Amino acid sequence: MRAALLIATLFPVGCLLLFAACSDRVAEPRRLDYELVASFPHDATASTQGLLLHDGLYYESTGGYGSSTLRQVDPESGKVLRLRDLAVRAFGEGLALRDDRLYQLEWKSGEGIIYDLETFDRVGEFRYEGEGWGLAWDGEHFILSDGTSVLRFLEPETFALVRSAEVRDHRGPVDLLNELEYIDGKIFCNRWHRDEILVIDSESGIVEAVLNLVALERPRPRDSEAVLNGIAHDPATGLLHVTGKCWPRVHVLRVSE
């Protein structure tokens, strides 16, 4: 009798736990396809850490102690139209545009630089906790990656933490999150030393799709650190512009299901 009562008591609890486990299950990400539309020349000495496209021009952050820069680049020719060197002690990282200001991360200092978009004059600084890898602007908050599985959403004036989202797929947390681009409610993200771009839901952190780019042209001979890194979106055409650290080309892609 007692055994029957115990089973009757525990059965609903077990059902609830099973339901909770099933409701937390994440679907395997969709696999995206692409068409290579064009390839443009890219400075093969530029270790790309951040890339964006605005009014037909690239804005690029490059890294390396003593070689970090902020650049304005003509896409089709690869010509650097404007360049600003960072301090020798600085290591440039992610880059985002908000209104008429460019925001550039530094890797380990916890400091970032604000520039005037037109002149590249330094007009301010900002601070954040931990390392800075990738940066994007979603129209309300900055989104920052730091190489972990967590994306931080930051208040634009104070850079205070508003919320965070752990990025997950069907296997669990996904780390090594690097360069970011915000596109229509989704976060497109490079993973360090991975030949793929993740498409992440900005609210839940769930990886909804993966774009495998292992077939793209890259440096020869292969440099182990010349990894895929750099995502820019052209809202006028919907095309994706991608490159990597010290890659000789920027590739323009039409992404499809």
Where are the predicted features?
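Short loop/turn segments that connect beta-strands within beta-propeller blades
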Residues: 74-77, 116-120, 156-159, 202-205, ...
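Short coil/turn segments that connect the beta-strands within blades of beta-propeller domains
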Residues: 55-56, 99-100, 139-140, 184-185, ...
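A short helix->beta-strand "capping" segment at the edge of beta-propeller domains
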Residues: 26-44, 78
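Surface loop/turn motifs at the tips and blade-to-blade linkers of beta-strand repeat domains
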Residues: 39-44, 84-88, 124-129, 166-172, ...
